[in-house]
């Protein structure tokens, strides 16, 4: 191997070790269940994004099997060549009916959706206003676009408006935000963001990755808690890989936006389409989340219980108001130690460190699901509290 390269890479890896930011892959089995096997140890699964428990649902499995038998295992090409099976258009129609939009585009992942859409819509002559805690895919899309990047303090509408006021009226402006923030579990102020985008002549993209299938009318997303609000969002992005238990993502909104992205988005044009089996499962999942109110109600209730009990115990869970509940520890070292102790006690509790979260805010990110019982959560809370006291972390 080229020696200068080897030296460079070894130095970088050593730095990651020293900073407590080195990452390993661990073998996991049965992650679609409430209890999983990780490194051959049985643990309560409080780490996955399978929020409604659909990843293991027999109806989705059967839909995937039927489509595999009919269409094969791969799409064989990009959608613009010969990979655009009728399944794609069926799913896109379902998304439009679900979200009340004109046109939709199914893409391969939430990351490629955000990177592709943002880098296609704006360029170096434009300005993007982005919440400081937005997902990495949003940040990377802005960087790739070359647009001026204005980051406003998390959920600070006054700061956002101050930035909008100073922007040149001639420049095109895009506001982009997560709706549910993936590492904090709090939510964006969508009504106020829409008011600002209208006041200053911007457009807005919302990332519903952690809200699709859960919140709003029929689980259509946080922007659908109020029907008239959703209609004022220019582009909605959501994923099938979390509450819907599948894989892939969608972009939807007014037809002209989606038509433009279909023609300009490089992460859509230059990639093989999703396999037919995935589309079959997605179609079934979209049906289920609209009909199965009980799953969504259970998830919301479990989130409320878990948050309230951790707050009562004295933990810092920030402003979480959803099914995503972080315990903010601070240092990488303490967070890794806490995570290790929790896993030894039978809880899948994964340390989240920079650059995923800001420096000095390392945490354990818990995610409850609709399938957890109160007994499961109480069992976990008792152990979390006991270990935190033993480690003299904060309780």
Curated annotation (Swiss-Prot):
<feature type="binding site">
    <location>
        <position position="23"/>
    </location>
    <ligand>
        <name>substrate</name>
    </ligand>
</feature>
<feature type="binding site">
    <location>
        <position position="135"/>
    </location>
    <ligand>
        <name>substrate</name>
    </ligand>
</feature>
<comment type="similarity">
    <text>Belongs to the class-II pyridoxal-phosphate-dependent aminotransferase family. BioF subfamily.</text>
</comment>
<protein>
    <recommendedName>
        <fullName>Putative 8-amino-7-oxononanoate synthase</fullName>
        <ecNumber>2.3.1.47</ecNumber>
    </recommendedName>
</protein>
<comment type="pathway">
    <text>Cofactor biosynthesis; biotin biosynthesis.</text>
</comment>
<keyword id="KW-0093">Biotin biosynthesis</keyword>
<dbReference type="InterPro" id="IPR015424">
    <property type="entry name" value="PyrdxlP-dep_Trfase"/>
</dbReference>
<feature type="binding site">
    <location>
        <begin position="207"/>
        <end position="210"/>
    </location>
    <ligand>
        <name>pyridoxal 5'-phosphate</name>
    </ligand>
</feature>
<dbReference type="InterPro" id="IPR050087">
    <property type="entry name" value="AON_synthase_class-II"/>
</dbReference>
<keyword id="KW-0663">Pyridoxal phosphate</keyword>
<feature type="binding site">
    <location>
        <position position="182"/>
    </location>
    <ligand>
        <name>pyridoxal 5'-phosphate</name>
    </ligand>
</feature>
<dbReference type="InterPro" id="IPR015421">
    <property type="entry name" value="PyrdxlP-dep_Trfase_major"/>
</dbReference>
<dbReference type="InterPro" id="IPR015422">
    <property type="entry name" value="PyrdxlP-dep_Trfase_small"/>
</dbReference>
<feature type="modified residue" description="N6-(pyridoxal phosphate)lysine">
    <location>
        <position position="242"/>
    </location>
</feature>
<feature type="binding site">
    <location>
        <position position="356"/>
    </location>
    <ligand>
        <name>substrate</name>
    </ligand>
</feature>
<dbReference type="GO" id="GO:0030170">
    <property type="term" value="F:pyridoxal phosphate binding"/>
</dbReference>
<dbReference type="GO" id="GO:0009102">
    <property type="term" value="P:biotin biosynthetic process"/>
</dbReference>
<feature type="binding site">
    <location>
        <begin position="239"/>
        <end position="242"/>
    </location>
    <ligand>
        <name>pyridoxal 5'-phosphate</name>
    </ligand>
</feature>
<comment type="function">
    <text>Catalyzes the decarboxylative condensation of pimeloyl-[acyl-carrier protein] and L-alanine to produce 8-amino-7-oxononanoate (AON), [acyl-carrier protein], and carbon dioxide.</text>
</comment>
<feature type="binding site">
    <location>
        <begin position="110"/>
        <end position="111"/>
    </location>
    <ligand>
        <name>pyridoxal 5'-phosphate</name>
    </ligand>
</feature>
<dbReference type="InterPro" id="IPR004723">
    <property type="entry name" value="AONS_Archaea/Proteobacteria"/>
</dbReference>
<dbReference type="InterPro" id="IPR001917">
    <property type="entry name" value="Aminotrans_II_pyridoxalP_BS"/>
</dbReference>
<dbReference type="InterPro" id="IPR004839">
    <property type="entry name" value="Aminotransferase_I/II_large"/>
</dbReference>
<keyword id="KW-0808">Transferase</keyword>
<dbReference type="Pfam" id="PF00155">
    <property type="entry name" value="Aminotran_1_2"/>
</dbReference>
<comment type="subunit">
    <text>Homodimer.</text>
</comment>
<dbReference type="GO" id="GO:0008710">
    <property type="term" value="F:8-amino-7-oxononanoate synthase activity"/>
</dbReference>
């Amino acid at each position: 191997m080229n020696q200068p390269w080897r030296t460079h890479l070894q130095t970088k890896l050593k730095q990651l070790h020293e900073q407590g930011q080195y990452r390993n892959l661990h073998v996991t089995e049965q992650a679609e269940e409430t209890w999983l096997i990780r490194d051959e140890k049985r643990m309560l699964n409080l780490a996955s994004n399978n929020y409604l428990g659909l990843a293991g649902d027999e109806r989705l499995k059967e839909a995937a099997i039927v489509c595999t038998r009919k269409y094969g295992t791969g799409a064989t090409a990009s959608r613009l060549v010969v990979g655009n099976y009728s399944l794609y258009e069926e799913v896109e129609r379902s998304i439009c009916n679900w979200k009340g939009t004109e046109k939709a585009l199914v893409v391969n992942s939430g990351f490629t959706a955000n990177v592709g859409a943002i880098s296609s819509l704006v360029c170096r002559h434009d300005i993007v206003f982005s919440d400081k805690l937005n997902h990495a895919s949003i940040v990377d899309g802005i960087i790739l676009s070359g647009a001026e990047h204005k980051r406003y303090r998390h959920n600070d509408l006054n700061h956002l408006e101050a930035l909008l006021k100073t922007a040149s009226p001639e420049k095109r402006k895009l506001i982009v935000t997560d709706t549910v923030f993936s590492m904090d579990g709090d939510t964006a102020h969508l009504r106020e963001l829409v008011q600002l985008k209208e006041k200053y002549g911007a457009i807005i993209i919302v990332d519903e990755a952690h809200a699709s299938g859960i919140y709003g009318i029929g689980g259509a997303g946080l922007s659908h808690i109020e029907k008239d609000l959703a209609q004022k969002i220019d582009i909605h992005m959501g994923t099938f890989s979390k509450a819907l238990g599948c894989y892939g993502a969608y972009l939807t909104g007014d037809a002209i936006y989606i038509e433009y992205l279909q023609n300009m988005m490089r992460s859509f044009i230059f990639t093989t389409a999703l396999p037919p089996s995935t589309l079959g499962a997605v179609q079934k999942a979209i049906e289920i989340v609209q009909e199965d109110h009980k799953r969504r109600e259970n998830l919301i209730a479990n989130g409320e219980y878990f948050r309230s009990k951790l707050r009562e115990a004295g933990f810092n869970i920030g402003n979480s108001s959803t099914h995503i509940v972080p315990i903010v520890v601070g240092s990488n070292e303490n967070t890794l130690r806490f995570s290790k102790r929790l896993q030894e006690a039978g809880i899948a509790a994964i340390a989240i460190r920079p650059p995923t979260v800001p420096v000095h805010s390392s945490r354990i990110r818990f995610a409850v699901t609709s399938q957890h019982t109160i007994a499961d959560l109480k069992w976990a809370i008792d152990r979390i509290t006991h270990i935190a006291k033993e480690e003299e972390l904060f309780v």
